[in-house]
């Protein structure tokens, strides 16, 4: 039912996905209009240059260094941003400088950043969760909490299979996947319990 009057403080933030391809951005800043209001707008950055870290380890001063320590340093045309806190975890994300400038110019402090790597569905189980975009594979290994999280370049089903084998090893655990049918079909040849979501 739609609320007719008053404000709705439980309104979910608006989300905008930014896919980083070949050092560029997949949206045109001119095509994005400034939304009226004061509600936050979350930008979900699709890039393999992202890592998760405990809140107490991350500050604006060391975010880029932490990203670099994981082998995912920002390129010369990028800088790091941090996500909002989620389950005591922060995502440190590399974002294109021009994209960041456009976002800040249009939305200022209303803008926040996130990553598909922060998806903690099934976090209480022993399992692997996989989300794939056009060129990135996001994997999270859980065992009653987050054990490992990786974002890797994966443009084919075989790339995703490689990363899944590397993360799961010989364990027989469920794999929950949000991806194309081709990826799920290939994974089912190697793993017993693959569930498409």
Where are these regions (language model features)?
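Hydrophobic/aromatic-enriched cytosolic interaction surfaces used to assemble or bind macromolecules
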Residues: 1-197
